[in-house]
């Protein structure tokens, strides 16, 4: 039995008003689908106004549109969140996945192709195909306990802490040399 810590809401998503990169565009494609199909996912970010989202020349009003947020607000009370990096790469990941993991919120994620090597078994994987991804998100909403990942936030903190990882990045010998100079 998978035990879920108490969180008052199921799923969130963060969007900006940017559309230059592939991740920006895919966020807006997902958001359009979510809002037009009335899927119960709360939306945060500068790409929205409290209660209002503009898309395809239309304005959509919804109580699910929360607007700008404080750093961890879209994660603390949510079991799941949708995380889409601005671009895909082999080893780059950002606060888009770090903040949810530190909040013990399971990310549905696309971006870093090798994310499992950094955060094994902590991530649900989006594909970039709107139909497959919406199917996954709807299944998560129907059966949260079946998809929830138990996240060791201490291990996440260790993985992303620059101070703890400096010797891994530069090697212990390089650190000793720079101290002696």
Where are these regions (language model features)?
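Pol beta-like nucleotidyltransferase catalytic core
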Residues: 1-44, 54-83, 88-181
């Amino acid at each position: 039995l998978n035990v879920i810590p108490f969180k008052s809401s199921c799923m969130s998503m963060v969007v900006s008003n940017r559309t230059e990169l592939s991740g920006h565009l895919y966020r807006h494609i997902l958001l359009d689908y979510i809002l037009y199909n009335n899927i119960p996912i709360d939306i945060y970010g500068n790409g929205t106004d409290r209660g209002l989202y503009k898309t395809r020349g239309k304005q959509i009003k919804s109580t699910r549109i929360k607007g700008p947020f404080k750093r961890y607000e879209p994660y603390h009370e949510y079991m799941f969140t949708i995380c889409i990096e601005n671009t895909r790469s082999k080893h780059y990941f950002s606060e888009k996945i770090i903040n949810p993991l530190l909040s013990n919120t399971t990310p549905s994620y696309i971006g870093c192709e090798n994310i499992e090597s950094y955060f094994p078994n902590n991530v649900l994987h989006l594909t970039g195909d709107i139909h497959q991804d919406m199917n996954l998100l709807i299944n998560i909403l129907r059966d949260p306990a079946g998809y929830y990942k138990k996240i060791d936030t201490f291990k996440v903190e260790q993985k992303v802490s620059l101070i703890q990882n400096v010797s891994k990045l530069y090697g212990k010998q390089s650190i000793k040399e720079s101290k002696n100079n």
